[in-house]
């Protein structure tokens, strides 16, 4: 029997016939974890339009579920990840973290980057498994290697995070965090561009480089990162009036209360 046939046979046994709706009043744990991870469609397009909109607007979630099952059984690895993702966070129907882990691992082993990322989320949050930053880091690396640049931001955050509870072994590594943010920035990940620019501009954990810091911050701001526009406005407020006004007003358009406060202060100054 081929590997594809084995997967089809296993899937047919794993997937339940019907889904169970989420409770009318979801508990604290559901509210805490709903929304973690990401579907394949969002991961590939970089936009929220896709499966999440389809689920949010669905009149019959059972029909959506059957369609995802049909596509997964036909060999669509993205649909397999999507099923695992939904059962992982339990936002659209009652979660099943054990089933989610099985489905995500099956999709990941077939090369799906989003599935590797979602496995990382499962181990980071401890959903149906022991919390393990080491496992989360490994899965995030697999996701990045398969093209998911967002995983670089997750790795950067992970290496800056101290373990506050439990007995797992994890070492904060600020230089490693910076290197992951830099890898993500070089691949176009917008938040990573901000993180790199901020560190270079302020000499945070790395040698200060104003020119390089401004370069990355401007790239981030140009793609909608409000904090980057704020940083640029603050930086130029003391040395370049024209660029200060430009970034201040752009930050305001992005919804920045800080930039709006700066404008109000400018207006009342003599």
Where do the language-model regions lie?
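Short helix-capping/linker turns of helical repeat alpha-solenoids
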Residues: 74-76, 89-91, 109-112, 125-127, ...
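Terminal, low-structured helical/coil segments at or just beyond the last alpha-helical repeat
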Residues: 234-270
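Canonical positions in the second alpha-helix
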Residues: 69-71, 105-107, 142-143, 182-184, ...
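Alpha-helical segment of the N-proximal tetratricopeptide repeat
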Residues: 43-92
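Structural signature of tandem alpha-helical TPR/SEL1-like repeats
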Residues: 57-66, 94-103, 130-139, 165-180, ...
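Hydrophobic face of amphipathic alpha-helices that form TPR/SEL1-like repeat modules
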Residues: 50-53, 82-89, 118-125, 154-165, ...
């Amino acid at each position: 029997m081929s590997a594809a046939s084995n997967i089809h046979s296993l899937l047919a046994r794993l997937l339940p016939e019907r889904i169970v709706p989420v409770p009318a009043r979801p508990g604290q744990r559901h509210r805490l974890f709903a929304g973690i991870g990401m579907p394949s469609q969002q991961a590939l397009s970089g936009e929220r339009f896709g499966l999440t909109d389809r689920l949010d607007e669905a009149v019959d979630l059972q029909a959506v579920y059957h369609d995802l099952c049909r596509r997964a059984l036909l060999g669509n690895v993205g649909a397999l990840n999507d099923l695992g993702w939904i059962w992982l966070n339990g936002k659209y129907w009652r979660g099943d973290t054990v089933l989610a882990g099985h489905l995500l691992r099956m999709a990941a082993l077939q090369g799906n980057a989003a599935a590797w990322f979602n496995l990382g989320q499962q181990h980071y949050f401890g959903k149906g498994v022991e919390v393990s930053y080491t496992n989360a880091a490994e899965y995030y690396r697999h996701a990045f290697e398969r093209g998911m640049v967002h995983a670089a931001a997750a790795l950067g955050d992970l290496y800056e995070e101290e373990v506050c509870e439990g007995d797992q072994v994890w070492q904060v590594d600020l230089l490693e965090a910076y290197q992951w943010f830099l890898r993500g920035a070089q691949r176009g990940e917008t938040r990573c561009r901000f993180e790199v620019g901020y560190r270079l501009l302020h000499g945070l954990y790395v040698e200060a480089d104003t020119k390089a810091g401004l370069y990355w911050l401007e790239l981030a701001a140009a793609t909608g990162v409000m904090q980057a526009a704020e940083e640029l406005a603050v930086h130029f407020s003391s040395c370049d009036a024209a660029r200060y006004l430009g970034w201040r007003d752009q930050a305001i358009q992005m919804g920045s209360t800080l930039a709006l406060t700066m404008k109000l202060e400018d207006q009342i100054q003599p």
